[in-house]
Every structure is written in C-alpha cells, then in structure tokens.
A protein has these predicted regions:
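Amphipathic, hydrophobic secondary-structure cores in small proteins
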Residues: 13-66
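Core SAM-dependent methyltransferase catalytic element
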Residues: 73-79
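Iron-sulfur (Fe-S) cluster-binding modules
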Residues: 1-2, 79
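Intrinsic-disorder/low-complexity, polar/charged segments enriched in Ser/Thr/Lys/Arg/Asp/Glu/Gln
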Residues: 8-10, 35-39, 71-73
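Right-handed parallel beta-helix/beta-solenoid
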Residues: 2-12
Length: 79
C-alpha cells in the first residue's frame, strides 16, 4: 500500500469491542463528504476482519492500514 494519507477525521475506537468500532465507523463515514478519509484506531483484534468486511460491503475502501504497538490503524476513504 502507498503512504498513509492525511486524515480528514480521526476516530478513536481503542478499548471498544465488536460491534462498537464498526458502529462508530459507520456513523463517522455517514457524516463525511465523498473522498474524505477517516483514520480509525482500534485495539480489538476482531477489527481487522470486521473493517475489511465493512469496507467491502459499503464500497468505502481501506486506503492504508498498519499496526503500531497493538493498535490497528485504518485509513478509510468515503466513496
């Protein structure tokens, strides 16, 4: 993947368990304009497959992702 883009919004989902990171992500993306990017940070290991499935189902692509000190970081662009 390319370098991480500068996010338009940052969503802190650290400490939250499924399904809350996806619930908060869905709400955040609905409030954004097309092509804007949200950076979501989560600590629930289930976030990796959950965000991938959510991205595929909603057509909002993950443009970058990484793990830093057990924090999963996802940059998602609103379609």
């Amino acid at each position: 993947m390319a370098d991480a883009p500068t996010p338009d919004r940052i969503l802190d989902a650290k400490g939250l368990l499924c399904p809350m990171p996806i619930v908060k992500l869905s709400k955040a993306v609905k409030e954004m304009e097309s092509q804007q990017v949200v950076l979501m940070e989560a600590t629930d290991p289930g976030s990796v497959p959950d965000v991938a499935a959510w991205s595929k189902n909603t057509h909002n692509p993950i443009v970058h992702q990484e793990v830093v000190d057990k924090v999963m970081r996802f940059w998602i662009q609103k379609a």
